[in-house]
Structure formats: structure tokens, C-alpha cells
UniProtKB/Swiss-Prot annotation:
This is Transcription elongation factor GreA. The gene is greA. InterPro entries: GreA/GreB_C_sf, TF_GreA/GreB_CS, Tscrpt_elong_fac_GreA, Tscrpt_elong_fac_GreA/B, Tscrpt_elong_fac_GreA/B_C, Tscrpt_elong_fac_GreA/B_fam, Tscrpt_elong_fac_GreA/B_N, Tscrpt_elong_fac_GreA/B_N_sf. GO terms for molecular function: DNA binding; RNA polymerase binding. Keywords: Coiled coil, DNA-binding, Transcription, Transcription regulation. NCBIfam families: greA, PRK00226.1-2, PRK00226.1-4, PRK00226.1-5. Residues 45-73 form a coiled coil. Gene3D superfamilies: Transcription elongation factor, GreA/GreB, C-terminal domain (3.10.50.30), Transcription elongation factor, GreA/GreB, N-terminal domain (1.10.287.180). One of its GO terms (biological process) is DNA-templated transcription elongation. Pfam families: GreA_GreB (PF01272), GreA_GreB_N (PF03449). It comes from Campylobacter jejuni subsp. jejuni serotype O:23/36 (strain 81-176). Necessary for efficient RNA polymerase transcription elongation past template-encoded arresting sites. The arresting sites in DNA have the property of trapping a certain fraction of elongating RNA polymerases that pass through, resulting in locked ternary complexes. Cleavage of the nascent transcript by cleavage factors such as GreA or GreB allows the resumption of elongation from the new 3'terminus. GreA releases sequences of 2 to 3 nucleotides. It comes from the Bacteria. The keyword Transcription regulation applies.
Length: 161
């Protein structure tokens, strides 16, 4: 079973979504199905079929979240040194072709937010950076082709969700 690294915030966010699905959305869709069923012929009952489809989506998401939470590895990135790129590291890199600098923080798969510079630890660029140190170069295959980067700095900054 592969562990999924995430912050406490990410874990709590997923747990809250799972609780809402189980405690609110699942019972509500059962009522919708019962109401639609009471309207008669199920073959041509669009309301019934829509409610059943919604129920399937809810059950699928419950299963997905339950699995993810069972595999969760809550990590406190403030508890270790960031002398190399790890989960929770904030990394400044430079594209060696364009000389464009970018800053990314490596977070769990459910915590990515590119507007804040938070990228999933499972993303290609994060995978390529893991374990690297300041001054190291790395290559990554992106949709636009292969790019080469240099790590300018690595540090820890508290996550701000």
C-alpha cells in the first residue's frame, strides 16, 4: 500500500469532505431517490435516473476518499531540515533556457494550488526535484518538451491555505 504524503491541513480537508458526503449528501440523495421513485414508472423517470447517477458519484467519491485517508501519511515539514528538496520544501528554480525564476512548494496530491505556487509532490517537476540540493541541475519532460532547471534555494515556509 503506497502512502500518500500530506499536511495535517490536507488530511483534515479530506476528512471533512468525507464526513459531509457520509452525513449529509448520501442521506439526501437517498431521499431524492425515494421521492423520484414515488412518481411512478422508473423507465422514463429522468428525476430517478439523475438521482441514481448522483448517488453513484457520491459513493465513488466516498470510496476514493476512504482509500486516500487510509493511505495518508501526515507530515509536518517544519520538523526536519530542508537541506535537500522534500515534501513541504519551498524551492526557487531557474529555467536554464529562458532564465525565468519560479518558486514552488511541494505539497500533497490534494493540496496543489498553482496560484499559490503549491505543486503536488506527484507532479513531474516535483518528482524531478526530490532529493536535489541547492545548485543542482535537473531535467524534466513537460508538455512543451524537455526543460532543464537549476535549484537556486530550498527552505521551509509555513503553508497558507
Amino acid at each position: 500500500m503506497q502512502k500518500e504524503p500530506m499536511s495535517q491541513f490536507g488530511y483534515d480537508k479530506l476528512a471533512a469532505e468525507l464526513k459531509d458526503l457520509k452525513d449529509n449528501q448520501r442521506p439526501a440523495v437517498v431521499i431524492e431517490i425515494d421521492t423520484a421513485r414515488s412518481h411512478g414508472d422508473l423507465k422514463e423517470n429522468a428525476e430517478y435516473h439523475a438521482a441514481r447517477e448522483k448517488q453513484a458519484l457520491i459513493e465513488s467519491r466516498i470510496a476514493e476518499l476512504s482509500d486516500l485517508l487510509a493511505r495518508a501519511q501526515v507530515i509536518d515539514p517544519s520538523s526536519y531540515e530542508h537541506d535537500s528538496v522534500k515534501f513541504g520544501s519551498s524551492v526557487v528554480i531557474i529555467d536554464l533556457d529562458t532564465e525565468k525564476e519560479s518558486k514552488y512548494t511541494l505539497v500533497g496530491i490534494c493540496e496543489g494550488d498553482l496560484d499559490k505556487g503549491y505543486i503536488s509532490i506527484a507532479s513531474p517537476i516535483a518528482k524531478a526535484m526530490l532529493g536535489k540540493k541547492e545548485g543542482d541541475d535537473f531535467k524534466v519532460r513537460l508538455p512543451k518538451g524537455e526543460s532543464e532547471f537549476e535549484i537556486l534555494s530550498i527552505n521551509y515556509e509555513p503553508l497558507k491555505f
